[in-house]
Every structure is written in C-alpha cells, then in structure tokens.
C-alpha cells in the first residue's frame, strides 16, 4: 500500500475546503452532502453536536448555540476592538475568561464554554473525517492555511486547533501563497512573472503580490482588510430588507434573532443568484408575526447597496503595489480567489483598475487555497512526482518585528514582507550607568512608537556586570521559522549569559496542558457523537420493526391465516412499543434494543408460524433489517420541532 497522503485544509471564516494530492493531481474532496466546501459552523443541541452543513441548516432554529466565525476570534484577546465589535453581530454569547474569549453555549442541557481553538478544531476534525471517508484510511498530516494578515498569535492558535483535532500540522501557510501554488503549478518555466492575488472570501480580504520564477514563489507584498467579505454584503442586504419590511408592514424585525437569521439565509442565496442573474426573488413564509415576506432585488440595487464596500477593495490593491514597488502595468497575472470574486461588479472594478486586463478565473475560486495547500502537503511529505518536484516556497513576515528602545521607539529587526524563515541579529546596549539588566520587549507592527504596535512578549536579561552606559554589548537575535513562529534571544557578550522567549504564551496562547485537555475532550465529544448515532439507529430500528410488524399482521392477504387472538397480541404489543417510543425518545441504545427483543419474543413465533407452511422467510424475516431501517420503514430521519 502506498504511504498515507497528507491533506491540505483551507480553514475559512465561513466555509472550509479540503484537498489531497494523489496520482499526480489534486482532488478537492466532497463531504457527505456532496458539497466541495463545508460551512465552518458548529452547533450544540440538547442531544448532540453538529458540524458543517448539518449545523448551518438548523441555525434558524437554534441561533444561540450555533457557532460560526471562530476564525474572527482565534488568537485574539477578549478586549481586542475587533472582538468587541464583532460580538454585537453574533447571536451566540462570547464571554471573557482571563482576557481570552470563549464561546458559551448550552449543550445537552448544560452550559459549556469553548475556546475558539476548540471550535476551529471541531471544524478541522470534520474536514479530516471528510478526507478519511474518501481516502479510506486515517489521515494525520496536514497543511492548514491562514490569511496573510494573521499575526503570530493567530497562527499559533490555528496550529493548536489542528493539534486538538488530532492532526500533525506540517506547516501553516498563507492563503494567497497557497492560491499561487495552485496557479503556479501549471505555469512553471515562463520567466519571472508578477502575480496579484485578489482573495475576497466570506470573512477576510487579502491582496498579495508574488513573483513566480521557474517554480520559486516569493511573496513581495501583502495587504488587505481582515474584516471584509461576503458576510458584509449579506449584512447590507439584510439591512435593506429590514427597512423594506418596516415600510411595508410597519414592524421592526431586527430584534427577532430567528427572523433575522432566516432573512440572512435568504439574502445569501439571493446574492449568489445575482452573480449569474440580474434579478433575484426572496420568498419567506411567516417571517415575523405570521407575515409572509415576498420581495425581489435587482443586481443594480445590490451593487448600489454595497458600492462603497466594493470600491474599498481597490485600496489594498494600491497599497500592495506600492509595497512591492511595482506599477500596475508590471503585473502579469491577476488571480481571483474566494467565492465573493464571482460578483460581476467586483470583477469589473478590478479589471478597470488594471485597464481592461483579463482576469484569471481558471481556478475555482472556492477551491484554489485548499488546492495549493494539498500540493504543499505533498511537497512536505516528499512527493516525488515531477509536477511538484521543482516547487519552492518562500513566505513572508506579515508585519515588522522588533523591540522597544529608549523613549518607546520601535526598532525593527525583521522588516515587514521579509522572506521567512529568517534570522536577524543586532547589538544593543544599556541606557544608564551600572544598569543591572535589560527588559527586552518584542513588538509587531509598522508604527514608529511601540505604544501603537502590538506587544508580543517580554523577558529580562539580568546579571549584567556594572558598567557605564553604552559599554555592555547585548546581542539580540530574532529568528522566525518556516511556520512564522518567532524565537528571540538576548546574550550579554561579556558574560555569555543569555535568555530567550518563544513568542507564544504571552499572546494568550493555550498551554500544553490546556491543549492536552482539549485533545481529550475532542475525543470525548467524538465518542459522544458516536453514541448518539448508535442510539438513533437503535431507535429507528425498533420503530421500523414495530411498524413493519403492525402492517404485516394487518395485511389483507393474511386474512384467515392468523387467529384474531394472535393478531390482537401483536397489535397490542406494537402499539405499546410505539407509545413507549413516543414517551421515551431520549432513551439509551440498550433500552431500545431491549424493547425490540421484547417485541420480537411476541412477534417472531406468530410470524414464523405463518410462514412455516408457505416456505417464506424464516423467523424475524419481517422488518428485521439492521439499524438502517428498511425500505419505507418508519422514519429514519427525525424532524426537529
């Protein structure tokens, strides 16, 4: 057997996608619903946990306990303004636990709180299972993508989510870099090309400029808006229709979460329709206080509602060009990534900005990132096929990294857009006479003063021998590895004494113990989900057996072959079981199985007696189907009330 493949996962804000490189090409893997992208949603109910399509489909019924957008929380502090402003829009509750955000839900009748890493790990587990179902063997190795804009803490937290999901994360790579790989594979050997990647997804917007030369990718610049995407366009439509509902019906639905959620689902559908048609209609029965809401919207109106958002996508394009020191005429290829790039107006704005240049849409925009991640996974696993052999990947640091020097000045050691992995060393000294130690404070950001940048961590180097200011030599080294994880070391040259920090924990990262605990819990939840599945199938098996027996003895063809007493005996027992089922829908698996045995003891002798003479099926021939419930037997799906 060939060795197990590694997978590439695009962990998106709203949708995720998984791919695998095998037999010389990438397969994007469809989930059990046949969809090639899976909603990044996790829902908790009184009885079970749902992930993906199943979670998103029940969101209107259970908004408080359906979690999405975990990517907007991951690796951030609770007090982060982004978190604070996003919380206003979410129907689920975010609580503060030591300045770490946690999502609070009700699950199986208890209140539970989860870290964003745990929610993301559930989505990753789902993606892992989708791949395993397709490949037919367990998968552990994966490459996971993040926005180019993600800082160290967000990258670390994403990696932790992978670990909790039971994955060995080979590498975290930038989404645009992954898209470039998807694109570059087919494009090797054409001399140097400058490629601009325009990635407008469900929740984030990234513009990246890469140079591809003979299979070598180099990221020249990244820019973007961590908070622009398809959801924002949905919100504009939602607001538009809330106002329309007020005008038509003099009622404000905006405080009714379920109504807004149903409206949002319809808006998302309308938005997708408007990418291919010039008009879309919405029909929502009994949206609010029994009022049906039937309306429509034109593409022109939609473009007008979002015009400022659409136009704002060009600012990061200009910024990236400036950072890469390129003129727009020097860009060879424009690549569209992310579902929202299907919007005709967005395409037109970009095309006009580049004076009518053709856009590259040959890659399915929803799948390009997972495609590239799958290729990268194959490279890291040492895939020998010539398609991937010559590909080398150079990533960049998204923000400058440095330390605070006297007066709160930011002194950058690693400049933004430096190719990583990289290592930079600089000599610093003391600020006052006989200073016994120095405090090394590590920041990321582009501003001149550290107070405007983001503190990553700090540590002391003490025990410096007394000396006049400016004499001691302290060598500081910043070292970023291929995953974008930073090690900072300070060494006193006179004594050789050193101290270092790996930038992780001070960023509110989870500790080893917490990750370990979450891995255990993830296993536990998975086991519970399994028990739930078995319970439901035992219930369905019992239900279908009871209904089958009932219809068997009521069959007209059996008139005269079965005594009324026997018939009554079977019908009474079936009715008893059916009533018991209605009253005990939440019983355990063995209770259902026990009831079924009880029922079989009554029915089997009677039914098999019927067929002794007729040479029909032996005992239990009727409805003794396995847990799946036979053809047309009892409901195998339960309706949610």
UniProtKB/Swiss-Prot annotation:
Changing residue 77 to R: Significant loss of acetylation and ATPase activity. Decreased binding to HOPX and HSP90 and increased binding to STUB1 and NAA10. GO terms for biological process: ATP metabolic process; cellular heat acclimation; cellular response to heat; cellular response to oxidative stress; cellular response to steroid hormone stimulus; cellular response to unfolded protein; chaperone cofactor-dependent protein refolding; chaperone-mediated protein complex assembly. The modification N-acetylalanine is found at residue 2. Keywords: Acetylation, ATP-binding, Chaperone, Cytoplasm, Cytoskeleton, Host cell receptor for virus entry, Host-virus interaction, Methylation, Nucleotide-binding, Nucleus, Phosphoprotein, Receptor, Secreted, Stress response. The modification N6,N6,N6-trimethyllysine is found at residue 561. SUPFAM superfamilies: Actin-like ATPase domain (SSF53067), Heat shock protein 70kD (HSP70), C-terminal subdomain (SSF100934), Heat shock protein 70kD (HSP70), peptide-binding domain (SSF100920). Residues 614-633 have a biased composition (Gly residues). The modification Phosphothreonine is found at residue 636. In response to cellular stress, acetylated at Lys-77 by NA110 and then gradually deacetylated by HDAC4 at later stages. Acetylation enhances its chaperone activity and also determines whether it will function as a chaperone for protein refolding or degradation by controlling its binding to co-chaperones HOPX and STUB1. The acetylated form and the non-acetylated form bind to HOPX and STUB1 respectively. Acetylation also protects cells against various types of cellular stress. Residues 614-641 are annotated as: Disordered. The modification N6-acetyllysine is found at residues 77, 108, 246, 348. ATP binds at residues 12-15, 71, 202-204, 268-275, 339-342. Component of the CatSper complex. Identified in a IGF2BP1-dependent mRNP granule complex containing untranslated mRNAs. Interacts with CHCHD3, DNAJC7, IRAK1BP1, PPP5C and TSC2. Interacts with TERT; the interaction occurs in the absence of the RNA component, TERC, and dissociates once the TERT complex has formed. Interacts with TRIM5 (via B30.2/SPRY domain). Interacts with METTL21A. Interacts with DNAAF2. Interacts with PRKN. Interacts with FOXP3. Interacts with NOD2; the interaction enhances NOD2 stability. Interacts with DNAJC9 (via J domain). PANTHER family: HEAT SHOCK PROTEIN 70KDA. This is Heat shock 70 kDa protein 1A. It comes from Homo sapiens.
């Amino acid at each position: 057997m060939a060795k197990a493949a590694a997978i590439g996962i695009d962990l998106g804000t709203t949708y995720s996608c998984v791919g695998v490189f095998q037999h010389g090409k990438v397969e994007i893997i469809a989930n059990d619903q046949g969809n090639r992208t899976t909603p990044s949603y996790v829902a908790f109910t009184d009885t079970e946990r749902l992930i993906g399509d199943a979670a998103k489909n029940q969101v209107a019924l259970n908004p408080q306990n359906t979690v999405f957008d975990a990517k907007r929380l991951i690796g951030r502090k609770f007090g982060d303004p982004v978190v604070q402003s996003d919380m206003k829009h979410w129907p689920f509750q975010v609580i503060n636990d030591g300045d770490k955000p946690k999502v609070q839900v009700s699950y199986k009748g208890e209140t539970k709180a989860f870290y964003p890493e745990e929610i993301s790990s559930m989505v990753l587990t789902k993606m892992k299972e989708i791949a395993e179902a397709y490949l037919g063997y367990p998968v552990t190795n994966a490459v996971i993508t993040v926005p180019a804009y993600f800082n160290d803490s967000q990258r670390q937290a994403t990696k932790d989510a992978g670990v909790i999901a039971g994955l060995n994360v080979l590498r975290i790579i930038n989404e645009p870099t992954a898209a470039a790989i998807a694109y570059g594979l087919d494009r090797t050997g054409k001399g140097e090309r400058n490629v601009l990647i325009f990635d407008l997804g469900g929740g984030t917007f990234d513009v990246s400029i890469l140079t591809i030369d003979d299979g070598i990718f180099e990221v020249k610049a990244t820019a973007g808006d961590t908070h622009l995407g398809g959801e924002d366009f949905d919100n504009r439509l939602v607001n538009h229709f809330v106002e329309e509902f007020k005008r038509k019906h003099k009622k404000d639905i905006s405080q009714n979460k379920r109504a807004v959620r149903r409206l949002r689902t319809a808006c998302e559908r309308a938005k997708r329709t408007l990418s291919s048609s010039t008009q879309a209609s919405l029909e929502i029965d009994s949206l609010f206080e029994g009022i049906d809401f039937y309306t429509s919207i034109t593409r022109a109106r939609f473009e007008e509602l979002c015009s400022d958002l659409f136009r704002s996508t060009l600012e990061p394009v200009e910024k990236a060009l400036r950072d890469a020191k390129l003129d727009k005429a020097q860009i060879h290829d424009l690549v569209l990534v992310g579902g929202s790039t299907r919007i005709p107006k967005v395409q037109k704005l970009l095309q006009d900005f580049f004076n009518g240049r053709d856009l590259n849409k040959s890659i399915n925009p929803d799948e390009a990132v997972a495609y590239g991640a799958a290729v990268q996974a194959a490279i890291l696993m040492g895939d020998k096929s010539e398609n991937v052999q010559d590909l080398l990947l150079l990533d960049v640091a998204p923000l400058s990294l440095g330390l605070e020097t006297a007066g709160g000045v930011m002194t950058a050691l690693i400049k933004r857009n430096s190719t990583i992995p990289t290592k930079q060393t600089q000599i610093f000294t003391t600020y006052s006479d006989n200073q016994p130690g120095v405090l090394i404070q590590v920041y990321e950001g582009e501003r001149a003063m550290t107070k405007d940048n983001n503190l990553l961590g700090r540590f002391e180097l003490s025990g410096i021998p007394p000396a006049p200011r400016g004499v001691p030599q302290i060598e500081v080294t910043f070292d970023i590895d291929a995953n974008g994880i930073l090690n900072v070391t300070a060494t006193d040259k006179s004594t050789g004494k050193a101290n270092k920090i790996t930038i992780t924990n001070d960023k509110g990262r989870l500790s080893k113990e917490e990750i370990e605990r979450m891995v255990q819990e993830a296993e536990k939840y998975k086991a519970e989900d399994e028990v739930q599945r078995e319970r439901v199938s035992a219930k369905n098996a019992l239900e279908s057996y009871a209904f089958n027996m009932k219809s068997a003895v009521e069959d007209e063809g059996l008139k005269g072959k079965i005594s009324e007493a026997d018939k009554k005996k079977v019908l009474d027992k079936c009715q008893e079981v059916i009533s018991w089922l209605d009253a005990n829908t939440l019983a355990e698996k063995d209770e259902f199985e026990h009831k079924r045995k009880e029922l079989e003891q009554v029915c089997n002798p009677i039914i098999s007696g019927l067929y002794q003479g007729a040479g029909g099926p032996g005992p239990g021939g009727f409805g003794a189907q396995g847990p799946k419930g036979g053809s047309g037997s009892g409901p195998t799906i339960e309706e949610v009330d």
